[in-house]
Protein backbone atom coordinates (compact mmCIF):
# COMPACT_ATOMS: atom_id res chain seq x y z
CA UNK A 1 0.00 0.00 0.00
CA UNK A 2 1.23 3.50 -0.84
CA UNK A 3 -0.07 6.99 -0.07
CA UNK A 4 -2.13 7.39 -3.24
CA UNK A 5 -2.74 3.75 -4.23
CA UNK A 6 -4.76 1.60 -1.83
CA UNK A 7 -3.77 -1.80 -3.19
CA UNK A 8 -2.43 -4.82 -1.31
CA UNK A 9 0.88 -6.42 -2.23
CA UNK A 10 0.64 -8.41 -5.45
CA UNK A 11 -2.51 -6.65 -6.69
CA UNK A 12 -0.74 -4.82 -9.51
CA UNK A 13 0.88 -6.53 -12.50
CA UNK A 14 4.49 -5.95 -13.58
CA UNK A 15 3.22 -4.32 -16.78
CA UNK A 16 0.76 -1.44 -16.66
CA UNK A 17 -1.07 1.03 -18.88
CA UNK A 18 -1.22 4.62 -17.64
CA UNK A 19 -4.03 6.79 -19.04
CA UNK A 20 -4.33 10.25 -17.54
CA UNK A 21 -8.12 10.06 -17.39
CA UNK A 22 -9.36 7.59 -14.74
CA UNK A 23 -12.52 7.04 -16.79
CA UNK A 24 -10.33 5.96 -19.70
CA UNK A 25 -8.71 3.48 -17.30
CA UNK A 26 -12.17 2.08 -16.58
CA UNK A 27 -12.99 1.99 -20.29
CA UNK A 28 -9.81 0.02 -21.04
CA UNK A 29 -10.54 -2.45 -18.24
CA UNK A 30 -14.17 -2.89 -19.29
CA UNK A 31 -13.38 -3.19 -23.01
CA UNK A 32 -10.17 -5.20 -23.20
CA UNK A 33 -9.49 -7.06 -19.93
CA UNK A 34 -10.94 -10.25 -18.48
CA UNK A 35 -11.26 -11.26 -14.82
CA UNK A 36 -10.98 -7.60 -13.82
CA UNK A 37 -10.45 -6.49 -10.22
CA UNK A 38 -10.54 -2.83 -9.17
CA UNK A 39 -7.63 -2.32 -6.78
CA UNK A 40 -7.78 1.46 -6.32
CA UNK A 41 -10.37 4.22 -6.01
CA UNK A 42 -8.36 6.71 -3.92
CA UNK A 43 -9.05 10.29 -5.13
CA UNK A 44 -11.21 8.78 -7.86
CA UNK A 45 -8.06 7.59 -9.65
CA UNK A 46 -9.18 4.12 -10.67
CA UNK A 47 -6.79 1.20 -10.97
CA UNK A 48 -7.64 -2.25 -12.36
CA UNK A 49 -5.88 -5.57 -12.88
CA UNK A 50 -7.04 -8.26 -15.27
CA UNK A 51 -5.81 -10.43 -18.12
CA UNK A 52 -5.40 -9.67 -21.82
CA UNK A 53 -4.82 -12.59 -24.17
CA UNK A 54 -3.88 -14.63 -21.12
CA UNK A 55 -1.31 -12.16 -19.76
CA UNK A 56 -1.77 -10.30 -16.48
CA UNK A 57 -1.88 -6.53 -16.96
CA UNK A 58 -2.94 -3.50 -14.93
CA UNK A 59 -4.27 -0.08 -15.88
CA UNK A 60 -3.99 2.95 -13.61
CA UNK A 61 -5.24 6.52 -14.03
CA UNK A 62 -2.57 9.13 -13.31
CA UNK A 63 -4.31 12.48 -13.60
CA UNK A 64 -2.95 15.45 -15.52
CA UNK A 65 0.52 16.96 -15.45
CA UNK A 66 4.07 16.14 -14.47
CA UNK A 67 3.58 16.22 -10.65
CA UNK A 68 0.66 13.79 -10.77
CA UNK A 69 2.45 11.42 -13.17
CA UNK A 70 5.53 11.59 -10.94
CA UNK A 71 3.54 10.49 -7.90
CA UNK A 72 1.85 7.51 -9.54
CA UNK A 73 4.88 6.29 -11.48
CA UNK A 74 7.08 6.46 -8.38
CA UNK A 75 4.59 4.62 -6.17
CA UNK A 76 3.90 1.95 -8.78
CA UNK A 77 7.61 1.22 -9.12
CA UNK A 78 8.72 1.62 -5.50
CA UNK A 79 5.75 0.06 -3.70
CA UNK A 80 4.42 -2.43 -6.25
CA UNK A 81 7.42 -3.48 -8.34
CA UNK A 82 6.05 -2.42 -11.73
CA UNK A 83 8.63 -2.99 -14.49
CA UNK A 84 6.91 -1.85 -17.71
CA UNK A 85 4.91 1.37 -17.82
CA UNK A 86 3.09 2.49 -20.97
CA UNK A 87 1.32 5.83 -20.98
CA UNK A 88 -1.72 5.92 -23.29
CA UNK A 89 -2.88 9.48 -23.74
CA UNK A 90 -3.77 12.31 -26.05
CA UNK A 91 -1.82 15.22 -27.46
CA UNK A 92 -2.03 18.24 -29.70
CA UNK A 93 -0.20 17.99 -33.01
CA UNK A 94 2.40 20.61 -33.93
CA UNK A 95 2.98 19.50 -37.54
CA UNK A 96 0.57 19.34 -40.45
CA UNK A 97 1.56 15.83 -41.53
CA UNK A 98 0.57 14.38 -38.13
CA UNK A 99 -3.22 14.37 -38.36
CA UNK A 100 -5.96 14.28 -35.74
CA UNK A 101 -6.46 10.64 -34.60
CA UNK A 102 -2.96 9.65 -35.75
CA UNK A 103 -0.84 7.50 -33.43
CA UNK A 104 2.41 8.97 -32.07
CA UNK A 105 5.12 6.91 -30.38
CA UNK A 106 7.15 9.28 -28.22
CA UNK A 107 10.86 8.58 -28.66
CA UNK A 108 11.88 11.41 -26.32
CA UNK A 109 10.33 14.27 -24.39
CA UNK A 110 11.32 17.93 -24.20
CA UNK A 111 9.85 20.01 -21.38
CA UNK A 112 9.56 23.45 -19.81
CA UNK A 113 9.33 21.86 -16.36
CA UNK A 114 12.04 22.18 -13.72
CA UNK A 115 11.62 18.51 -12.81
CA UNK A 116 15.14 17.69 -14.00
CA UNK A 117 16.90 21.02 -13.52
CA UNK A 118 16.70 20.61 -9.74
CA UNK A 119 18.12 17.07 -9.28
CA UNK A 120 20.67 17.56 -12.08
CA UNK A 121 21.78 20.94 -10.65
CA UNK A 122 20.83 23.03 -13.67
CA UNK A 123 22.14 20.59 -16.24
CA UNK A 124 19.93 19.05 -18.91
CA UNK A 125 18.76 15.42 -18.77
CA UNK A 126 17.22 13.98 -21.94
CA UNK A 127 14.23 11.75 -21.04
CA UNK A 128 13.87 8.98 -23.61
CA UNK A 129 11.69 5.94 -24.16
CA UNK A 130 12.86 2.39 -23.51
CA UNK A 131 13.85 0.74 -26.78
CA UNK A 132 12.64 -2.61 -25.40
CA UNK A 133 9.11 -1.18 -25.51
CA UNK A 134 9.43 1.23 -28.42
CA UNK A 135 10.60 -1.34 -30.98
CA UNK A 136 7.83 -3.91 -30.39
CA UNK A 137 5.20 -1.17 -30.14
CA UNK A 138 6.28 0.24 -33.50
CA UNK A 139 6.35 -3.19 -35.13
CA UNK A 140 2.91 -4.07 -33.77
CA UNK A 141 1.44 -0.75 -34.90
CA UNK A 142 2.81 -1.25 -38.41
CA UNK A 143 1.49 -4.82 -38.54
CA UNK A 144 -1.96 -3.48 -37.62
CA UNK A 145 -1.76 -0.88 -40.38
CA UNK A 146 -1.84 2.15 -38.07
CA UNK A 147 1.11 4.08 -39.65
CA UNK A 148 2.60 5.35 -36.36
CA UNK A 149 4.60 8.58 -36.22
CA UNK A 150 7.77 8.27 -34.11
CA UNK A 151 9.60 11.29 -32.72
CA UNK A 152 10.06 13.75 -29.91
CA UNK A 153 7.15 15.34 -28.07
CA UNK A 154 6.89 18.32 -25.72
CA UNK A 155 5.72 17.87 -22.11
CA UNK A 156 4.41 21.24 -20.95
CA UNK A 157 3.60 22.48 -17.46
CA UNK A 158 1.27 25.07 -19.01
CA UNK A 159 -2.01 24.17 -20.70
CA UNK A 160 -3.29 27.72 -21.29
CA UNK A 161 -0.15 29.36 -22.66
CA UNK A 162 -0.21 33.16 -23.02
CA UNK A 163 2.42 32.91 -25.75
CA UNK A 164 0.32 31.69 -28.67
CA UNK A 165 3.35 31.33 -30.95
CA UNK A 166 5.64 29.36 -28.61
CA UNK A 167 4.66 26.00 -30.10
CA UNK A 168 6.23 26.96 -33.42
CA UNK A 169 9.73 26.83 -31.92
CA UNK A 170 9.20 23.26 -30.74
CA UNK A 171 7.73 22.30 -34.10
CA UNK A 172 10.77 23.78 -35.87
CA UNK A 173 13.04 21.50 -33.85
CA UNK A 174 11.05 18.39 -34.66
CA UNK A 175 8.58 17.99 -31.79
CA UNK A 176 5.51 16.24 -33.16
CA UNK A 177 3.10 17.49 -30.51
CA UNK A 178 2.42 18.51 -26.93
CA UNK A 179 1.12 16.75 -23.82
CA UNK A 180 1.87 17.10 -20.10
CA UNK A 181 3.34 13.91 -18.60
CA UNK A 182 5.92 12.00 -20.62
CA UNK A 183 9.07 13.84 -19.50
CA UNK A 184 8.27 12.79 -15.93
CA UNK A 185 7.47 9.18 -16.83
CA UNK A 186 10.69 8.69 -18.81
CA UNK A 187 12.82 10.36 -16.15
CA UNK A 188 11.41 8.27 -13.31
CA UNK A 189 11.72 5.06 -15.32
CA UNK A 190 15.38 5.88 -15.99
CA UNK A 191 15.95 6.60 -12.30
CA UNK A 192 14.66 3.17 -11.27
CA UNK A 193 15.98 1.21 -14.25
CA UNK A 194 12.59 0.11 -15.57
CA UNK A 195 10.93 0.40 -18.98
CA UNK A 196 8.62 3.21 -20.08
CA UNK A 197 6.90 4.27 -23.28
CA UNK A 198 4.27 6.80 -24.29
CA UNK A 199 1.69 6.19 -27.00
CA UNK A 200 -0.40 9.21 -27.94
CA UNK A 201 -3.45 9.75 -30.10
CA UNK A 202 -3.71 13.21 -31.61
CA UNK A 203 -6.87 14.84 -30.22
CA UNK A 204 -6.42 18.37 -31.55
CA UNK A 205 -4.26 20.25 -34.03
CA UNK A 206 -2.32 23.51 -33.68
CA UNK A 207 -2.08 23.99 -37.46
CA UNK A 208 -5.51 22.95 -38.75
CA UNK A 209 -7.41 23.67 -35.47
CA UNK A 210 -9.34 20.40 -35.78
CA UNK A 211 -10.44 18.92 -32.43
CA UNK A 212 -12.07 15.78 -31.07
CA UNK A 213 -14.86 15.67 -28.49
CA UNK A 214 -14.38 14.93 -24.79
CA UNK A 215 -16.44 11.74 -25.20
CA UNK A 216 -14.25 10.55 -28.07
CA UNK A 217 -11.10 11.19 -26.03
CA UNK A 218 -12.51 9.17 -23.14
CA UNK A 219 -13.97 6.16 -24.92
CA UNK A 220 -12.31 5.69 -28.31
CA UNK A 221 -8.76 5.81 -29.65
CA UNK A 222 -8.74 2.00 -29.52
CA UNK A 223 -5.77 1.66 -31.88
CA UNK A 224 -3.47 3.13 -29.25
CA UNK A 225 -4.87 0.86 -26.55
CA UNK A 226 -4.54 -2.27 -28.68
CA UNK A 227 -0.93 -1.47 -29.56
CA UNK A 228 -0.08 -0.90 -25.90
CA UNK A 229 -1.72 -4.12 -24.74
CA UNK A 230 -0.21 -6.24 -27.51
CA UNK A 231 3.20 -4.76 -26.72
CA UNK A 232 2.83 -6.04 -23.16
CA UNK A 233 1.72 -9.46 -24.39
CA UNK A 234 4.84 -9.72 -26.55
CA UNK A 235 7.35 -8.83 -23.83
Swiss-Prot record:
GO cellular-component term (any): cytosol
GO term, biological process aspect, one: purine nucleoside catabolic process
Keyword match Transcription regulation: no
Annotated InterPro entries: DeoD-type, Nucleoside_phosphorylase_CS, Nucleoside_phosphorylase_d, Nucleoside_phosphorylase_sf
EC number from the UniProt entry: 2.4.2.1
Leader sequence residues: none
Keywords for the protein's UniProt record, in alphabetical order: Glycosyltransferase, Transferase
Enzyme class per UniProt: transferase
Residues annotated for phosphate binding in this entry: 20, 24, 43, 87-90
Pfam families cross-referenced by the UniProt entry: PNP_UDP_1
Keyword Cell cycle among UniProt keywords: no
UniProt-annotated catalytic positions: 204
Gene Ontology molecular-function annotations: purine-nucleoside phosphorylase activity
Residues engaged in binding a purine D-ribonucleoside: 4, 179-181, 203-204
Residues under site feature: Important for catalytic activity: 217
Family per similarity comment: Belongs to the PNP/UDP phosphorylase family.
Name used for this protein in its record: Purine nucleoside phosphorylase DeoD-type
Organism, as annotated: Clostridium tetani (strain Massachusetts / E88)
Amino acid sequence: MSIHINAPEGAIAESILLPGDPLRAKFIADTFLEDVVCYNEVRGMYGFTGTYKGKRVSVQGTGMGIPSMSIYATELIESYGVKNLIRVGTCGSYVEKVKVRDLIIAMSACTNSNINLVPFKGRTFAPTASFDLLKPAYDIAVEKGFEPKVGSIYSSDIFYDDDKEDWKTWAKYGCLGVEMETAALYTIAAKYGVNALTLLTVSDHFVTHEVTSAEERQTTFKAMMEVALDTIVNL
